[in-house]
Amino acid sequence: MESQAATPSSLSGESCTLDLPAVCDTSSYEASQRVSQGSSNSLSSLESHPFLSSSTTDPDSNSLNTEQKGSWDSENFWLDPSSKGQLETNEEEDGLRKSLDRFYEAFAHPLPGSGDPLSASVCQCLSQTISELEGQESQRYALRSFQMAQVIFSRDGCSILQRHSRDTRFYPLEQEGSSVDDEEPTPGLSREVIRFLLEQTVMKDS
C-alpha cells in the first residue's frame, strides 16, 4: 500500500516538474505578446500623428511663396504679349474715337456766310439723327456715316441731294430723279445716308 501511495505523489511531482517548462513557455509567450503589442501601439500612434509638413513648421516660407506667386502673376500680365497688346489696342481705339468726335464736332456746321437754308436744314436733320445714334455700339458705323455726311454737306452744300430729289427744279427734266446708284459716289458720303435724306420732309419741301 505504501508503495502504491507513494506512486501517485511521485507522479504528481513529476507532472509538476514536467509542467514547469510549459508554464515558463507561457510566461515568455505572454511577455513577447506584450512587447509586440507595445510596438504595434507605438506604430499606430505614429500613424495617427503624422509628421508636420514643411509649410506648417516654417510659416515664413509659406508667406514667401505667396509673395513670389503674386509677383510672378503681375510680371506674367505685363510680359504676356496678348494682354499688353489688348490693353494698348483699347487705349488706341478710345483715343481715335475721341479724336473723330472732336473732328466731326468742329466741322459739322455750315460755313459762315454760306446763305444756304437747305444746307442748314439738312445739317439740323443730321444732327438730330446723330443724337439718336450716339451711345449705341451696334450703330457705330451708321453714326460715323451720318457724321461724315454732315461734314461734307456743311462744306459743299446740298447740290448732291438736289440732283437726286424728284421735286427739284434746278436740272432739266431728263435728269430729274436720277438714281443714286447711277452716279459716281462722293468720297466719304454713304448712299444710304443720301436715300435717308431724300425721304425726309426737309428735302420734299425744297
UniProtKB/Swiss-Prot annotation:
Residues 56-74 have a biased composition (Polar residues). Keywords: Chromosome, DNA damage, DNA repair. GO terms for biological process: DNA repair; negative regulation of double-strand break repair via homologous recombination; positive regulation of double-strand break repair via nonhomologous end joining; positive regulation of isotype switching; somatic diversification of immunoglobulins involved in immune response; telomere maintenance in response to DNA damage. It comes from the Eukaryota. GO terms for cellular component: chromatin; site of double-strand break. Disulfide bonds: none annotated. Coiled coil: none annotated. It is found in: Chromosome. Its main location: nucleus. Residues 32-55 have a biased composition (Low complexity). Residues 27-94 are annotated as: Disordered. InterPro entries: SHLD1 (IPR027821), SHLD1_C (IPR053898). Component of the shieldin complex, which plays an important role in repair of DNA double-stranded breaks (DSBs). During G1 and S phase of the cell cycle, the complex functions downstream of TP53BP1 to promote non-homologous end joining (NHEJ) and suppress DNA end resection. Mediates various NHEJ-dependent processes including immunoglobulin class-switch recombination, and fusion of unprotected telomeres. Component of the shieldin complex, consisting of SHLD1, SHLD2, SHLD3 and MAD2L2/REV7. Within the complex, SHLD2 forms a scaffold which interacts with a SHLD3-MAD2L2 subcomplex via its N-terminus, and with SHLD1 via its C-terminus. Interacts with ASTE1. This is Shieldin complex subunit 1. It comes from Mus musculus (Mouse). The gene is Shld1.
